[in-house]
């Protein structure tokens, strides 16, 4: 039988729900994804080309005033449940921290979230590898065009994007 692929919300809910079911008094979860491309050119030739795709989830668990934090890049239901259970066990033996808490609804109302604000702060179009290579070449060519410069340690160009989600 095929395993159901969990989406980001499912992953975060599973971690928090499992922590609560195993004795946590509260929990919050952060999930981040990023991807990108980087190219290094040296003396007109490709020296390094990298592509990355990262995924990481963090879980902070409270057992009264005892806190534990864990992170994982696993995304199977079985692994996530185990991570959440371990976090609760860690929190149970952690020293108390009376100053750490998840903000209550009352506290959050003092500083309401303005959900209608959206900041599109990046270009969402991924450039091709050739465009990134051309940008690195252009930078190196400019440096080498300076009178007296005869060698280069190379030039880098890269593109990346990421997103971070928080659930309480």
Where are these regions (language model features)?
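Active-site bordering "gate/hinge" segments
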Residues: 1-168
């Amino acid at each position: 039988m095929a395993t159901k692929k969990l989406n980001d919300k499912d992953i975060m809910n599973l971690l928090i729900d499992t922590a609560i079911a195993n004795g946590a008094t509260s929990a919050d979860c952060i999930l981040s994804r990023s991807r990108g491309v980087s190219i290094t050119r040296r003396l007109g030739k490709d020296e390094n080309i990298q592509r990355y795709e990262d995924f990481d989830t963090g879980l902070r668990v409270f057992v009264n005033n005892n806190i534990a934090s864990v992170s994982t890049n696993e995304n199977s239901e079985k692994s996530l449940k185990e991570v959440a259970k371990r976090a609760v066990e860690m929190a149970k033996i952690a020293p108390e921290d009376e100053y750490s808490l998840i903000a209550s609804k009352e506290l959050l109302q003092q500083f309401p979230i303005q959900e209608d604000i959206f900041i599109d702060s990046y270009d969402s179009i991924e450039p091709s590898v050739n465009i990134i290579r051309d940008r690195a070449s252009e930078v190196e060519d400019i440096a080498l065009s300076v009178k007296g410069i005869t060698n280069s340690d190379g030039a880098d160009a890269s593109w990346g994007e990421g997103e971070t989600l928080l659930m309480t």
